[in-house]
Amino acid sequence: MIQEQTMLTVADNSGARRVMCIKVLGGSHRRYAGIGDVIKITIKEAIPRGKVKKGDVLKAVVVRTKKGVRRPDGSVIRFDGNACVILNNNSEQPIGTRIFGPVTRELRNEKFMKIISLAPEVL
């Protein structure tokens, strides 16, 4: 459950380390984002010589949340932290070429097959 001002870790090699959600996209007064939702983020911490720099405003898709996601069989998949993958503002394709950590199958429904194929583990 991600809302404005939430800090997230970045699960790709785009060069960002920590980002902050500044807007939940999809609806005029939408408050929360879950796994598979697109958010607007700003880079708060980045490594030198990365593809993005501190202060950049980009889109990202949420791939892991502490709140987790409920499956139709009643099971819940939760993670230790909140993480996202940074997207290109125009094409909504990932900026990074590698994904770190597991992602959930729910991304498959949300047109993020590129992230699924790059991820080391799909739960």
UniProtKB/Swiss-Prot annotation:
List, in alphabetical order, the Gene Ontology terms for molecular function in this entry: large ribosomal subunit rRNA binding; structural constituent of ribosome
Give the CC-aspect GO terms.
cytosolic large ribosomal subunit
User: Which biological processes are named by the entry's GO terms?
Assistant: translation
Coiled-coil positions are: none
PROSITE patterns assigned: RIBOSOMAL_L14
**Matches recorded under Pfam families:** Ribosomal_L14
* CDD domains, per the entry: Ribosomal_uL14
UniProt keywords, alphabetically: Ribonucleoprotein, Ribosomal protein, RNA-binding, rRNA-binding
Task: Say if the entry is tagged with keyword Ribosomal protein.
Answer: yes
Q: InterPro entries per the record?
A: Ribosomal_uL14, Ribosomal_uL14_bac-type, Ribosomal_uL14_CS, Ribosomal_uL14_sf
The record describes the protein's role as: Binds to 23S rRNA. Forms part of two intersubunit bridges in the 70S ribosome.
* The protein's assembly and partners: Part of the 50S ribosomal subunit. Forms a cluster with proteins L3 and L19. In the 70S ribosome, L14 and L19 interact and together make contacts with the 16S rRNA in bridges B5 and B8.
Matching PANTHER family, A to Z?
50S/60S RIBOSOMAL PROTEIN L14/L23 (PTHR11761), LARGE RIBOSOMAL SUBUNIT PROTEIN UL14M (PTHR11761:SF3)
Family as reported in the entry's similarity comment: Belongs to the universal ribosomal protein uL14 family.
**How is this protein named in the record?**
Large ribosomal subunit protein uL14
Provide the species name.
Serratia proteamaculans (strain 568)
